[in-house]
């Protein structure tokens, strides 16, 4: 643990000097507090809805970042370190109920290509765990998994797969974090949803569906649910759909993840 803390301190200093910590790589105001890298957590975790204290928890002497890494999300973080270190194939990831897309990030030094961070996506004072891509994140800031605490236990709320991908979004004007969910049922049926986390679950704020099976000549629909049933959605033209999708993709936000190469 001492070795990890020393490495973390060095890494934090480098990030502070070169990039500034905890902000998306898009332009973000300096007072943005929605994202905090694993190296930056210096305040104690909130006591509201905190994991049930055990004797081991009470005696824990690490700082907040260590607590979330070593206790709260220990298993979720560790399993990706194991998989990346051993360079599992897609099937092994799926067998362990993990994102198979991580298997596409082994170029060069695999442990440098994937990392994790903590964010308070729903503003309740409890950090969610985000595991995502570092490699090529400026072009495709893919999120592999998002974990939240629900009833004091870690619960997976998002996982990218071969036909569905998640991305973090940051709306600078509103100082608001959200999540984009891109899903495909094939070339004739696909959608992009914009989500807000609340009480450990995602709520749809808006979505755009392309469904040529429902209407080949006018396949675009605005939706506010994820049931894929466009009969209760609003038909829109292609120009409107393109505008909504462009606005959503323009605020995709790459994170300054703590790389797994520095995890151990």
Spans of model-derived segments:
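Acidic, small-residue rich beta-repeat scaffolds with periodic aromatic anchors
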Residues: 22-27, 31-34, 41, 50-84, ...
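Blade-edge motifs of beta-propeller repeat domains
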Residues: 55-110, 155-165
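Acidic/hydrophobic-patterned starts of short beta strands in beta-sheet-rich repeat architectures
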Residues: 123-133, 173-180
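Positively charged n-region of N-terminal signal peptides that target proteins for export
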Residues: 1-10
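Beta-propeller blade repeat segments, especially FG-GAP/WD-type strand-to-loop junctions
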Residues: 140-159, 195-198
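Short, solvent-exposed loop/turn segments at conserved positions within beta-propeller repeat blades
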Residues: 138-142, 186-189
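C-terminal motif of bacterial Sec signal peptides marking the signal peptidase cleavage site
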Residues: 17-20
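Beta-propeller blade termini
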Residues: 112-121, 165-178
């Amino acid at each position: 643990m001492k070795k990890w803390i020393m490495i973390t301190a060095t890494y934090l200093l480098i990030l502070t000097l070169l990039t500034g910590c905890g902000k998306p790589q898009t332009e973000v105001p300096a007072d943005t507090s929605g994202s905090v890298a694993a190296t930056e957590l210096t305040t104690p975790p909130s006591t509201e809805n905190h994991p049930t204290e055990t004797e081991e928890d009470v005696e824990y002497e690490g700082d907040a970042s260590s607590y979330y890494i070593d206790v709260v999300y220990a298993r979720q973080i560790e399993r990706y370190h194991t998989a990346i270190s051993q360079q599992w194939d897609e099937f092994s990831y799926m067998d362990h109920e993990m994102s198979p897309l991580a298997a596409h990030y082994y170029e060069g030094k695999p442990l440098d290509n994937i990392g994790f961070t903590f964010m308070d996506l729903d503003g309740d004072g409890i950090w969610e765990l985000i595991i995502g891509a570092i490699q090529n994140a400026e072009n495709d800031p893919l999120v592999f998994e998002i974990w939240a605490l629900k009833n004091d236990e870690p619960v997976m709320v998002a996982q990218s797969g071969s036909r569905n991908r998640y991305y973090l979004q940051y709306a600078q004007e509103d100082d608001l974090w959200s999540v984009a969910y891109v899903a495909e049922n094939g070339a004739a049926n696909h959608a992009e949803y914009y989500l807000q986390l609340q009480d450990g679950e995602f709520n749809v704020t808006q979505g755009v569906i392309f469904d040529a099976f429902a209407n080949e000549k006018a396949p675009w629909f605005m939706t506010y649910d994820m049931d894929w049933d466009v009969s209760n959605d609003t038909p829109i033209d292609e120009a409107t759909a393109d505008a909504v999708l462009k606005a959503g993709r323009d605020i995709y936000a790459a994170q300054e993840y703590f790389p797994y190469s520095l995890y151990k």
